[in-house]
Amino acid sequence: MAGAAAFVEADNAEEIMARIETKSQKIESLLKHYKHVEALKTALDGSPPKTLDERCKSANWIVVHRAIMAIKDIEGMLNSLTAEYYDILMKYLYRGLSTGDEPTCEQCLMIHEKLTERAGLGCILRCLSDTTNTV
């Protein structure tokens, strides 16, 4: 498979899972201190999009989902994020919408609306057209 070298090998999946667990603990601490935006930034940082291991993707989604669901002030959150976070956040919003869970979909749609206003349609197009870096 051409380009497979860019993806993380399966034996590195345990290393990725350990990093996700560490990140999860940090996010829980931030959420307990009502630092929701910092928790979201931490969740989005180092997301493992270049792995084919679904366990890693699912574990990271759980961490990002926890941070997304804690966001109450969407405008404030978007003001605190830099543009580099927009595309990866959009990917996770679509992952959230695919769950079919009503509270998750509701939160993801609210963030999606504000993020699209801020980042434009290009953010959606980049997210949907990037089939290599999936979450």
Curated annotation (Swiss-Prot):
Family affiliation: Belongs to the ARPC5 family.
Record-linked InterPro entries: ARPC5, ARPC5_sf
SUPFAM superfamilies named among the record's database cross-references: Arp2/3 complex 16 kDa subunit ARPC5 (SSF69103)
Organism annotation: Arabidopsis thaliana (Mouse-ear cress)
Superkingdom of the organism of origin: Eukaryota
Protein's cellular compartments: Cytoplasm, Cytoskeleton; Cell projection
Keyword terms: Actin-binding, Cell projection, Cytoplasm, Cytoskeleton
Chief location bin: cytoplasm
Listed GO MF terms: actin binding
Annotated GO CC locations: Arp2/3 protein complex; cell projection; cytoplasm
GO biological process entries: Arp2/3 complex-mediated actin nucleation; regulation of actin filament polymerization
Name of this protein: Actin-related protein 2/3 complex subunit 5B
Quaternary structure, from the entry: Component of the Arp2/3 complex composed of ARP2, ARP3, ARPC1/p41-ARC, ARPC2/p34-ARC, ARPC3/p21-ARC, ARPC4/p20-ARC and ARPC5/p16-ARC.
Coiled coil spans: none
Function: Functions as a component of the Arp2/3 complex which is involved in regulation of actin polymerization and together with an activating nucleation-promoting factor (NPF) mediates the formation of branched actin networks. Arp2/3 complex plays a critical role in the control of cell morphogenesis via the modulation of cell polarity development.
